[in-house]
Each structure stands twice: as C-alpha cells, then as structure tokens.
Amino acid sequence: MPESPPLPKRSPLMTSSTTRPASDYPPGGDAFRHRHLTGIAQLTPWEISYILDAAEEWVELNRSGAAKHDDRLAGLTIINAFFENSTRTLLSFEIAGKRLGADVVNMHAAQSSVKKGETLIDTAMTLNAMRADAIVIRHASSGAVQLIADKVDCPVLNAGDGRHEHPTQALLDALTIRRRLGRVEGLAIAICGDVLHSRVARSNILALTLLGNEVRVVAPATLTPPAMERMHVRCFTDMDEGLKGADVVMMLRLQNERMDGAHLPSAREYHALYGLTPQRLEKAKPDAIVMHPGPMNRGVEIDSSVADDHARSTITEQVEMGVAVRMACLDILTRRQRGVPGWN
C-alpha cells in the first residue's frame, strides 16, 4: 500500500475522554485514507483518534440498545476467515458486523481448504470470487493478512497475524485507557510478560508511543524482542522496577504454543518473578489500572485477586470496548463502497 499523504493539521489532537462526534471531521478521504486495516503501523495519531472517537459513539449506542436497530451495513457480506482459533476476537467481530446489519459468515481453520493443502493465495482468490464486502482475517503467519489484502477487491481487517500485529486489540486498549483515565497521552504504561511472541504487545507499543506515552517493556531477557530501543520503549527485567509509578499495567499471557522450554524454566518460577500480585501492584500508582487482552493464565502472569478487582481491572471492559472499536472499523472501511457522501 502506498504511503498515505499527510493529513491536514488539527489542534489539539483528540485524545481526551470528552469526544466530539466522529462526523465533526473533514469529510471522507481527508479523515481516513486507508482501504484496509492491516496494522497500527499504517496509522497516524490523528487517524487513531478518529477511530477512537467513532468507537466512543458506538459504546453509548450499544449500552442504550440503540445499536441493535442500526442497519447501515444491510446488504453487505462480511467473512470472518479465522485460520487460528479464537473466542473473543471472533465473537466480537461477529457481533460488530451483525449489530451494523451485515450478513456475517464465519470460516474456521478446520473448515477451510488450507487443511487440504490449498495455498493462501488460492484462498484469497476464492474469497475474492465470492464478492465479500469485507474480510476479517486471523492467521498464524506474520504478513498473511497483507498478502490477502493485496489479492482482494474489498477491505481487509487484521484480526491478528503471527507475531506481527493485532491492530483492533491495540485500539480497544487505547479506548479503555482513555475512558478510565481521561486521556491516552502522557502516561507511563508497563507492558509485562511474553512480549517476544505477542502481536498484541507490538501493536500496543506502536499505538501508545505514537500517542505520546512512556511505554515500558517488562519481561525476562528471553522473552524480550531484540532491538526494542528502536520502538522507543524502556526495557526492564526487574518487575518491581518496571512497575514503579506506572499508570497502566498491561499483562500478557505466556504463549506456550509459540515457544519451546528454553524461554523459561517453569510457570511457578515465572509467577514468582513476573506474576502480578496485589503486593507487586503497589509499586504502580495508587490509581493505576490493570489490563489483560485475554485469555488469562490465572496464577501465572496474574493473580485472581488482581484480575477480579473491578476498581482497577479493566479486563471485562476491554471486551466491551472491542465490540465498539470493531463496529467503528467496519463502518469506516466500508464507507466508500457504500457511497457515503465525501468518501469517494
């Protein structure tokens, strides 16, 4: 995808919890120029804010029940092509599409011809021939989503590809932070755990640094990606040091399916050094929030008493924000093909 031209300057950047309507932006191409959403890396701070502001509206419409009567995507077909197992993300995209009135078709890895030896390019050509109006893809290989996006005629949304990116997770996390803390800039945010294998961590680092936060990576050396300084983060191997003064503590699960035993000796030792306990959380600010993208390994990276502390834990709120963010993304990316005025 060619690099988007710079957007016109706006001041200030819209990141506070009090948002203007998403309609109060320059029309169409001046607001959001992308055909696909393959990663946070393609977005500007202003474009991230644009999506978050649109999602804010969907949060309130979902809570009031009004979103169930929305039909702006009526007549459109969305294919959720998940080549990796998923519960939260798949259900979230399915609910998002249906609340917007679209016909939603879920394709699971076990049902796909990939299991029979079909190449990813052939799968992309097959999906394109079915004339879907949008395709949501999760795949175990980094870059698979971009490969498919290059072969199809409709918008493609990345629901997670290998270790690469998970953009809607980062967007929903940013929205959760903004609603809880009133802003999503100028904060100290500690991302803790298996950062090496985490596409969630990568997308969050990209988004949160772009929005002007101090991002810290807290992990064993064996689970810290190389050259992290290029991503403008501070790295800590000591959990207590990494949590000092943090506004946000984001925990990540150990992705055992993507690692071998060489990365850490045991789950018990990992919990002793990197598990988030009430005592360890005291190192962060008194009003710090605790996040986790799920699924959680209780008693490994996070204690149940911390995960279930609703005053500080945002875990269920993140799930709610996920539906709103994905509704916003589906709406925005299909505006051109729906002929929305200003989105030519």
Curated annotation (Swiss-Prot):
Instruction: Please state the pathway this protein functions in, per its UniProt record.
Output: Pyrimidine metabolism; UMP biosynthesis via de novo pathway; (S)-dihydroorotate from bicarbonate: step 2/3
**Binding sites annotated in the UniProt record for carbamoyl phosphate:** R88, T89, R138, H166, Q169, G294, P295
**InterPro entries (UniProt xref):** Asp/Orn_carbamoyltranf_P-bd, Asp/Orn_carbamoylTrfase, Asp/Orn_carbamoylTrfase_sf, Asp_carbamoyltransf, Asp_carbamoyltransf_Asp/Orn-bd
GO BP annotations, alphabetical order: 'de novo' pyrimidine nucleobase biosynthetic process; 'de novo' UMP biosynthetic process; amino acid metabolic process
Its EC number(s): 2.1.3.2
Q: Name one GO cellular component term.
A: cytosol
> Could you tell me the keywords of this UniProt record?
Pyrimidine biosynthesis, Transferase
Q: Does the keyword Ribonucleoprotein apply?
A: no
User: Which region ranges are annotated with the description Disordered?
Assistant: 1-30
Query: Its quaternary structure?
Result: Heterododecamer (2C3:3R2) of six catalytic PyrB chains organized as two trimers (C3), and six regulatory PyrI chains organized as three dimers (R2).
> What is the role of this chain?
Catalyzes the condensation of carbamoyl phosphate and aspartate to form carbamoyl aspartate and inorganic phosphate, the committed step in the de novo pyrimidine nucleotide biosynthesis pathway.
Name of protein: Aspartate carbamoyltransferase catalytic subunit
Species, as recorded: Sphingopyxis alaskensis (strain DSM 13593 / LMG 18877 / RB2256) (Sphingomonas alaskensis)
Give the taxonomic lineage as stored in the record: Bacteria, Pseudomonadati, Pseudomonadota, Alphaproteobacteria, Sphingomonadales
